[in-house]
Amino acid sequence: MRQTALALAGALSCLAATAAPAASPADTYPSRIVKMIVPFPAGGTTDIFARHIGDRLAKAFGHNFVIDNRGGAGGNIGSDAVAKADPDGYTLLVGTVGTHAINSSLYTRMTFDPLKDFAPVAYLAGVPNIMEVNPKNVKATTVQEFIAEAKASPKKLSFASSGNGTSIHLSGEMFKQMTGVELVHVPYRGSAPAVNDLIAGQVDLMFDNLPSSIEQVRGGNLRAIAVTSLKRSVALPDVPTIAESGLPGFDASSWFAIFAPAKTPPEIVAKLNAEVLKALADPELQKRFADIGGEIRPYKPDELGAFVKAEIEKWAKVVKTSGAKIE
């Protein structure tokens, strides 16, 4: 009888073990610090959005989301580090239109594939660039006045960028191509040092992401000539678009999104996406983003993936037309 009872107990135990659902990697995620790599220096637009969302994720999950700035090569250095990281959800990338839509067409050699080597997590925001000038160096207050001033002195005026191949750089190249003006390109390792030199008068013009320059524009240190989106920005409603200023069709907006290494468990990606969307639905964060020109899109991972694919195709045409290439 005792043997029968033991056998029955053993059978029930095995049955219970078989019926128990397998543990998901997301069940205990995160259990330690998560690193968010920003592939540009601190102080730029990518860094601003990363810190906003990193703070929210830390509060939601109870573990710090630490920002790790790794600038260089138009964002490729930091992006490559994430592409090669363990796909466990503890190393994330705050990617951009540059790292995931432009660079694959611009650079002759890439160490990662923006589609194959990453798992899309969540879209953060899209922003226009500001065509801004040092008010002491440049007299122009409109796009047409700037074109006239630049054509009067070919190659005298310079434009700064956050690095070769960034949307900030290509905005300038598009402007040169569509207007025929000759400007000297001065690349920097990130937006922050470029803006500092623009304010100091070391360079004359920049097509910077709106968030990293808007306070300098509002404070009078820089003069906004126009924005690069097709519609005016709610953050600077009185500043016209380049398209409405005599260059119809001009559109060079930037965007920012979170990516994980490819093969990161879908459950972890879904968990991160859910918390990001929850944070982006908060009116307080929405206002913060709107104040710096950020337009939120509540994309699911598959929607972000489709968006990135379309952006790669769009910017490939822009890069080809511009003739820009980086070895």
Range-by-range predicted roles:
Residues 1-31, 326-327:
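Short, low-complexity disordered leader/linker segments with a strong preference
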Residues 22-116, 156, 180-205, 216, ...:
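N-terminal (or domain-start) structured segment
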Residues 24-26, 117-121, 243-249:
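Short beta-strand/turn micro-motifs at beta-sheet edges
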Residues 31-33, 178-179, 218, 241, ...:
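An extracytoplasmic/periplasmic, membrane-proximal ligand-sensing/linker region
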Residues 84-90, 105-193, 242, 255-288:
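Hinge/capping helix and adjacent helix->loop/strand transition within the periplasmic-binding protein
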Residues 94-99, 161, 191, 208-213, ...:
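Beta->alpha turn/N-cap motifs
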Residues 100-109, 169, 174-178, 205-239:
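A ligand-binding cleft/hinge motif common to bilobed small-molecule-binding domains
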Residues 126, 212-281, 310-313:
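C-terminal lobe and pocket-closing loops
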